[in-house]
């Protein structure tokens, strides 16, 4: 069974910040993952395509907030590592996304770029 992924940090569109700031997502993620996520995501481009559904994701249903529909996501708890330092986090796999199949979004209770000193093209290891 697959137990780790490797990929390189890439820039996103900044949309993760908006979604991660919504109270319903924050509350659901805190209940499921045990932490309130930082308001943003880290995009990582894998060197291959994987089927995230094979990794037993936890599903979060669609919901309405302030008269707008928000689509559900799938979560996979992970450890995000750079060298020997790791942080608890999760892969967030939105039902509706514009990312190619080999780009994943990561969340954590901290700003990963800052606390892991990450820049575009840095290699990260994701422990499943």
Swiss-Prot record:
Example of a GO biological process term: riboflavin biosynthetic process
Species assigned in the record: Methanococcus aeolicus (strain ATCC BAA-1280 / DSM 17508 / OCM 812 / Nankai-3)
Protein family: Belongs to the archaeal riboflavin kinase family.
NCBIfam families: ribK_Meth (NF040694)
Cofactor details (free text): Binds 1 Mg(2+) ion per subunit.
Keyword Lipid biosynthesis part of the UniProt annotation: no
Reaction it catalyzes: riboflavin + CTP = CDP + FMN + H(+)
Record-given protein name: Riboflavin kinase
Binding-site residues for Mg(2+), renumbered to this chain: 41, 43
Pfam families xref list: CTP-dep_RFKase (PF01982)
Binding site for FMN: 97, 105
Domain of life: Archaea
Pathway(s) it belongs to: Cofactor biosynthesis; FMN biosynthesis; FMN from riboflavin (CTP route): step 1/1
């Amino acid at each position: 069974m697959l137990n780790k992924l490797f990929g390189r940090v890439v820039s996103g569109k900044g949309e993760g910040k908006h979604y991660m700031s919504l109270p319903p997502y924050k509350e659901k993620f805190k209940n499921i993952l045990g932490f309130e996520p930082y308001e943003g995501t880290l995009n990582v481009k894998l060197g291959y395509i994987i089927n995230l559904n094979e990794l037993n994701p936890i599903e979060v249903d669609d919901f309405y907030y302030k008269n707008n529909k928000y689509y559900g996501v799938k979560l996979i708890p992970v450890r995000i590592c750079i060298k020997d330092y790791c942080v608890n986090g999760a892969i967030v796999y939105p039902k509706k996304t514009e990312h190619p199949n080999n780009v994943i979004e990561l969340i954590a209770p901290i700003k990963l770029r800052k606390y892991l000193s990450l820049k575009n093209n840095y290699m990260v290891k994701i422990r499943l």
